């Protein structure tokens, strides 16, 4: 076991996702069963007391890997010496709110957090943005951390990836473990493109195994893209445990690598691959090794896939222009 704890900062720590996330981190599921962690919980002042209550519960769980818990309402202090940052807290869209208002409100959160990460985080900092709009929030934070390599900022599409695996497995009547090489392209929004044309199921492509293009276009893609809204409708609250689980998966894969013969999905700064403008934080098929994500290259895209990817990338470019116009990047 490593003797030096890894500092993990979680923002929005008193929220539902934070509550579902923190106990799994403390149990070793984020980084591995031999890596101790010190948790740093960041909240807005009015939620600090609730976060302190969660800290008490974490202490009471007596996790062998938990080296300590600290609660902050100041970003500079919360990110000091941090190795892994999970940016969960964000301003949700409320009824009647325009997209510009949403982006502006979140800019007020992610700009100072990016600055705090830039000034105080550890040299090996890795950042995962969970709070929506995740891709553009990640872009805002990354822009304000110019001394941190851009590749250290990612946004979460692993929840969409996991949802796509689950839907395909359900359709084919196979365990989720048999599904490999699913891809989520583009934005973590309703325009995302869940791609099963390169997926593998028992030696066949996902699309070939399904054998029903109408189901793919009219049921599978919309069901995955709009699953969050479906859960709100059924549960009466947004998905929290599944989002926390996906965040765990994302960071664990980033640190420990993807299995041989498989890849995952993550929103990372584009290097121009697949025609996605450089610098946009877009979801790609990625492998992880040595603590770095790499975009899977050389995948052939048919006209259907190209159109879907381009539509989502257009939305990302529009969001980038909107935050640029607001002076946030």
Swiss-Prot record:
Q: Which Pfam families match?
A: Ldh_1_C (PF02866), Ldh_1_N (PF00056)
Q: Give a GO molecular function annotation for the protein.
A: L-malate dehydrogenase (NAD+) activity
Q: What Enzyme Commission number does this protein have? A: 1.1.1.37
The UniProt keyword set, sorted, is: NAD, Oxidoreductase, Tricarboxylic acid cycle
An annotated GO BP: tricarboxylic acid cycle
Residues that hold NAD(+) according to the record:
12-18, 106, 113, 130-132
User: Where does the chain bind substrate?
Assistant: 93, 99, 132, 163
Which reaction is recorded as catalysed by this protein? (S)-malate + NAD(+) = oxaloacetate + NADH + H(+)
Q: Which residues form the active site?
A: 188 (proton acceptor)
Instruction: Return the PROSITE patterns for the record.
Output: MDH
Asked whether the UniProt record includes Iron-sulfur among its keywords, one would answer: no
**InterPro entries to which the protein is assigned, alphabetical:** L-lactate/malate_DH (IPR001557), Lactate/malate_DH_C (IPR022383), Lactate/malate_DH_N (IPR001236), Lactate_DH/Glyco_Ohase_4_C (IPR015955), Malate_DH_AS (IPR001252), Malate_DH_type2 (IPR010945), NAD(P)-bd_dom_sf (IPR036291)
Under the heading PANTHER family, the entry gives:
MALATE DEHYDROGENASE (PTHR23382)
NCBIfam families from the xrefs?
MalateDH-SF1, PRK05442.1
**According to its UniProt entry, what is the function of this protein?**
Catalyzes the reversible oxidation of malate to oxaloacetate.
Homology family: Belongs to the LDH/MDH superfamily. MDH type 2 family.
What is this protein's name? Malate dehydrogenase
Taxonomic source organism: Frankia alni (strain DSM 45986 / CECT 9034 / ACN14a)
What is this protein's gene name? mdh
